[in-house]
Amino acid sequence: STPPEKGPSEEELSELLARLVYSTMAAMPNWQIVSESEVREVGQSIPPGADMARLRKIGEMVYADALIVGRVERYRERIGNEWGAKSPASVAFALNLIDVRRGDVIWSARFDETQKALSENIFALGQIGQRGIRWLSAEQLTQEGVRKAVGELHQILVRGTAAS
């Protein structure tokens, strides 16, 4: 028998979340975004760690007002295909927007979903228009969550109701 497929590493998941957040944000109007590669390059010149001082330093070096930081909490791939899944995709992640000057979190979002069959969740009828009647991969589910979170952040910032 073949060994079970090993899922993506923590680093690969971080890169996936960063790529999805960046591409989603870059597609929206009214804000300037520092390229993912520039942030990564600057980040390599600063000693590793996830502390606020390091994040603020990266933000200052790329002349950003704020940084968005993500953390993948769960990433389980669907077992089966889009028309029949033995086990659905399950994804959880958190995003925090950090004010570079003050060093505090000014917005956060959390996405946590395990896709359910329509027969299990009649309230999912509203999602059919967006997803169709199919089982999403973990990456597709992550993309959907990123779109929701970034869309919410964009509305808040464009309306100017975020803390300043």
Locate each region found by the language model.
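Short, hinge-like loop/turn segments at secondary-structure boundaries
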Residues: 51, 86-87
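N-terminal segment of the mature soluble domain
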Residues: 1-73, 100, 104-108, 144-159
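C-terminal/domain-edge helix-coil "capping" segments
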Residues: 58-62, 85, 98-164
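Extracytoplasmic/secreted cell-surface and envelope-processing proteins
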Residues: 77-82
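Conserved beta-strand and immediately adjacent loop positions that scaffold enzyme active sites
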Residues: 92-96
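Hydrophobic core residues within well-ordered beta-strands of beta-rich domains
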Residues: 66, 89-91
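Short, glycine/charged-enriched secondary-structure capping and boundary segments
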Residues: 13, 83-86
